[in-house]
């Protein structure tokens, strides 16, 4: 098996999206608007509090209540539409990918497939391709949405003071880029090992079924079952380790978010005490940061979940890139 870097696998998989680029742009636009609506519902709450305390606000109180209601409804509609577009893209591409894999298998038959583990092939065609749904539905558009959302929110918060904008940028980059990269490095090749073991187990089960009569004839049923249980336990152990990594990733992400929220509150309070910003420069940037980690959290979770996906993509690309043992010659007498 050829081992490719995560970026190589990602670039190859993104290249398949080209025929559905319009739907991807639509999903990104709707997702961005939806996340902005969700964040500004909380920001409108901060402006309403300022209005009640007698501070000047950019929007009157009645308009704030109307905007909160409208934004809540729009958020729901756009969230649904974004997910519909993403999953339409994902399942269309999975069908396209399966078609390409079957074409590759026909090209490789029979010489290259004769000695290949049939159970492993079934695992690639079914579960490995199915795992790519995570990449197409929950990775490409969320990454672009997070980048655009970060720019907009950093500019919005930075309008109160440049230091607050830089702090917000550091928060988004840490949660959305640094944490998933570190988690991915710590996971190592766990995802590839898990998918390889899953394929080997599928092959073992298939061989056991096909050789059932011989197993019964030679009284090897108990030994075969013990080996199957041992392989299953090893696979479950690897999966448990990956889930522990995902759990630690979530815990670290939530802790970092709380620390940056506290840092925003303390920094804005210090600037207010120094006369650099008013009370609105404390309240609005703080609640804006509180409510705006959604896109970054979606990326933080990918540090552990994408390990399986990239491993599955690597196994699928192995089949697509495989060269036939014998070149097919047609149309020559």
Regions found by a protein language model. Give the residues of each.
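Membrane-integrated ABC transporters
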Residues: 1-38, 57-64, 82-86, 90, ...
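Juxtamembrane helix-loop junctions of ABC transporter transmembrane domains
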Residues: 6, 29, 38-46, 50, ...
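An intracellular "coupling" helix at the cytosolic face of ABC transporter transmembrane type-1 domains
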Residues: 14-22, 107-113, 127-136, 140, ...
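Transmembrane helix-loop-helix hairpins at lipid-water interfaces of multipass membrane proteins
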Residues: 18-78, 158-163, 276-279
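Transmembrane helices of ABC transporter permease
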Residues: 19, 23-34, 138-193, 266-278
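Hydrophobic alpha-helical transmembrane bundles that constitute the permease/transmembrane domains
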Residues: 32-40, 72-80, 135, 139-151, ...
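Helix-loop-helix
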Residues: 51-66, 156-170, 245-314, 319-320
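Primarily ABC-family ATPase nucleotide-binding module
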Residues: 320-333
């Amino acid at each position: 098996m050829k081992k490719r870097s995560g970026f190589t696998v990602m670039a190859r998989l993104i290249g398949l999206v080209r025929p559905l680029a319009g739907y991807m742009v639509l999903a990104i636009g709707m997702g961005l608007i939806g996340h902005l609506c969700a964040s500004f519902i909380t920001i409108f709450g901060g402006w309403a509090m300022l209005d009640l305390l007698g501070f000047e606000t950019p929007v009157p109180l009645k308009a704030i209540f109307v905007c909160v209601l409208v934004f809540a409804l729009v958020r729901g509609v756009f969230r649904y539409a974004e997910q519909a577009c993403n999953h339409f893209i994902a399942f269309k591409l999975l069908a396209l990918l399966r078609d390409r894999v079957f074409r590759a298998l026909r090209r490789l038959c029979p010489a290259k497939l004769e000695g290949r583990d049939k159970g492993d092939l079934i695992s690639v065609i079914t579960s490995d391709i199915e795992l790519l749904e995570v990449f197409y539905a929950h990775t490409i558009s969320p990454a672009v949405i997070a980048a655009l959302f970060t720019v907009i929110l950093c500019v919005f918060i930075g309008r109160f003071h440049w230091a607050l904008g830089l702090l917000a940028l550091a928060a988004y980059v840490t949660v959305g880029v640094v944490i998933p990269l570190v988690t991915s490095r710590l996971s190592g090749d766990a995802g590839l090992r898990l998918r390889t073991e899953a394929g080997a187990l599928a092959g073992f089960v298939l061989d056991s079924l096909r050789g059932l009569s011989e197993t019964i004839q030679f009284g090897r049923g108990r030994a075969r079952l013990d080996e199957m249980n041992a392989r299953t336990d090893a696979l479950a152990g690897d999966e448990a380790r990956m889930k522990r990594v995902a759990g630690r990733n979530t815990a670290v992400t939530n802790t970092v978010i709380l620390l940056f929220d506290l840092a925003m509150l303390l920094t804005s309070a210090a600037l207010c005490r120094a006369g650099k910003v008013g009370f609105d420069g404390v309240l609005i940037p703080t609640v804006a940061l509180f409510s705006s980690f959604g896109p970054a959290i979606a990326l933080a979770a990918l540090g552990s979940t994408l390990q399986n996906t990239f491993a599955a993509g690597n196994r699928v690309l192995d089949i697509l890139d495989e060269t036939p043992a014998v070149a097919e010659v047609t149309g020559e007498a």
